[in-house]
Curated annotation (Swiss-Prot):
Together with its co-chaperonin GroES, plays an essential role in assisting protein folding. The GroEL-GroES system forms a nano-cage that allows encapsulation of the non-native substrate proteins and provides a physical environment optimized to promote and accelerate protein folding. The keyword Zinc-finger does not apply. InterPro entries: Chaperonin_Cpn60_CS, Cpn60/GroEL, Cpn60/GroEL/TCP-1, GroEL-like_apical_dom_sf, GROEL-like_equatorial_sf, TCP-1-like_intermed_sf. Gene3D superfamilies: GroEL, GroEL-like equatorial domain, TCP-1-like chaperonin intermediate domain. This is Chaperonin GroEL. It comes from Helicobacter acinonychis (strain Sheeba). NCBIfam families: GroEL (TIGR02348), PRK00013.1 (NF000592), PRK12849.1 (NF009487), PRK12850.1 (NF009488), PRK12851.1 (NF009489). The gene is groEL.
């Protein structure tokens, strides 16, 4: 297929047009008074959202060059959301403002490479000042404030997230699910839970709830398949003498072994339950080791030279309470040594930091949470499917932003943090580097101006008023007042501001230093010719039908 090439100003102007259209669609969602955007879906009802990245993801433009510009900035919004959970609209507004200011200067003859260098230096200096002005997230109240702001000022969601974080800690896993009704709920699973239920319903101890509960129990951990009773008979005899219940976690238990266990359970000879080991392959081995560390046991594995026939009671893990239903097993109050658990947690954190796979990272974080204290499930309720999706997106964003705040600290919100940081930056640059520096200094006012405009105020006036002051002074767009942002709880995670600025500068630099674009020429489909109508000449006599 033939390709078209566009050069210099012609290419950059079309790229800018794409960025402008994306920016205009996304900017309306910014701030506490941001508006909704209605998005047509290929099937089903349209979706309504106030989430910048959800709007950006839907945008495809007909002009191929303009679309390339839009797609690059869309990528920035997505990357910012992935890394920090929020700040997608901030990143888009900043990218547009930097590109707009930069394009004006480059069209006037500035050197794009020198301009880029100045922009990078300015961004780095502003980020350093942001870090200095940040403060650590203190208690539950500040976590509630961050979550509330990220959930578009929904205090209810903010409180749910703060409660969840308080229950499971900053390393705990918090998941978001759809509730059956219209009320929001929070469920917390204490201890370690994995998705394997009992191998036979005959292990149940509570017929009403269909659960098996074992108190002060031993836990046998093995990566072997148990099919013969003689494999575990010596160990069963030893545990029976102590009169304690036993949970067997193995690759599988089948045939004669499972039948014998069930029969002895029904006769009351053994207080026992059996489940399959969680996970698959290497992940299963690691999860068995996690359970062993948590319960103070040892995985009986032939790789380690251990066999079930020769296993001793000392190899068994111990737990205060174990609850098993048809789908899940929960181990509460594992009796492992705290320093062993801490070492294991540190090891998993190192693996999380070094892995490049999102899937592996997610699974490692789940393991970390199970060792660290538990899992919280926020169940989001809504009256309709459209509202449910929009609300669930907001909760996901708020959760990520809150984790970012706990991780790196918080700065004043409402777009004021960037302005405050820029006020403290004084770089002495020359030539076109200075031009790049000044571009960033002007562009960082854009988020505050846009928040004010969306709330019905003059953006320029608000920016000037905020610039006159120092410290934590900023603009509360909810009521139009100038306040101490920390005292009012108007705060943003440092990570969100940092990544939004870094990503915006990165994509703007790429666009400004673009000298040519290459795209496919759309071929117009030829309209098929009309068939010969000659045989219809006799229709002239139809005039009499009038």
């Amino acid at each position: 297929m033939a390709k078209e090439i566009k050069f210099s100003d012609s290419a950059r102007n079309l790229l800018f047009e794409g960025v402008r259209q994306l920016h205009d669609a996304v900017k309306v969602t910014m701030g506490p008074k941001g508006r909704n955007v209605l998005i047509q879906k290929s099937y089903g009802a349209p979706s309504i959202t106030k989430d910048g990245v959800s709007v950006a993801k839907e945008i495809e433009l007909s002009c191929p060059v303009a679309n390339m510009g839009a797609q690059l900035v869309k990528e920035v919004a997505s990357k910012t959301a992935d890394a920090a959970g929020d700040g997608t609209t901030t990143a888009t507004v900043l990218a547009y403002s930097i590109f707009k200011e930069g394009l004006r200067n480059i069209t006037a003859g500035a050197n794009p490479i020198e301009v880029k260098r100045g922009m990078d230096k300015a961004a780095e200096a502003i980020i350093n000042e942001l870090k200095k002005s940040s403060k650590k997230v203190g208690g539950k109240e500040e976590i509630t404030q961050v979550a509330t702001i990220s959930a578009n000022s929904d205090h209810n969601i903010g409180k749910l997230i703060a409660d969840a974080m308080e229950k499971v800690g900053k390393d705990g896993v918090i998941t978001v699910e759809e509730a059956k009704g219209i009320e929001d709920e929070l469920d917390v699973v204490e201890g370690m839970q994995f998705d394997r239920g009992y191998l036979s319903p005959y292990f149940v101890t509570n017929a009403e709830k269909m659960t098996a509960q074992l108190d002060n129990a031993y836990i046998l951990l093995t990566d072997k398949k148990i099919s013969s009773m003689k494999d575990i008979l010596p160990l069963l005899e030893k545990t029976m003498k102590e009169g304690k219940p036993l949970l067997i976690i193995a690759e599988d238990i089948e045939g004669e072994a499972l039948t014998t266990l069930v029969v002895n359970k029904l006769r009351g000879v053994l207080n026992i339950a059996a489940v399959k080991a969680p996970g698959f392959g290497d992940r299963r081995k690691e999860m068995l080791k996690d359970i062993a560390v948590l319960t103070g046991g040892q995985v009986i594995s032939e790789e380690l030279g251990l066999t079930l026939e020769n296993a001793e009671v000392e190899f068994l893990g111990k737990a205060g309470r174990i609850v098993i239903d048809k789908d899940n097993t929960t181990i509460v109050d594992g009796k492992g040594h705290s320093h062993d658990v801490k070492d294991r947690v540190a090891q998993i954190k190192t693996q999380i930091a070094s892995t490049t796979s999102d899937y592996d990272k997610e699974k490692l974080q789940e393991r970390l949470a199970k060792l660290s204290g538990g899992v919280a499930v926020i169940k989001v309720g809504a009256a309709s499917e459209v509202e449910m999706k929009e609300k669930k997106d907001r909760v996901d964003d708020a959760l990520s932003a809150t984790k970012a705040a706990v991780e790196e600290g918080i700065v004043i919100g409402g777009g004021a943090a960037l302005i405050r940081a820029a006020q403290k930056v004084h770089l002495h640059l020359n030539g076109d580097e200075k031009v790049g520096y000044e571009i960033i200094m002007r562009a960082i006012k854009a988020p505050l101006a846009q928040i004010a405009i969306n709330a019905g105020y003059d953006g320029g006036v608000v920016v000037n008023e905020v610039q006159k002051h120092e410290g934590h002074f900023g603009f509360n767009a909810s009521n139009g007042e100038y306040v101490d942002m920390f005292k009012e709880g108007i705060i943003d995670p440092l990570k969100v501001e940092r990544i939004a600025l870094q990503n915006a500068v990165s994509v703007s630099s790429l666009l400004l230093t673009t000298e040519a674009t290459v795209h496919e020429i759309k071929e117009e489909k030829a309209t098929p010719a009309m068939p010969d109508m000659g045989g219809m000449g006799g229709m002239g006599g139809m005039g009499g039908m009038m």
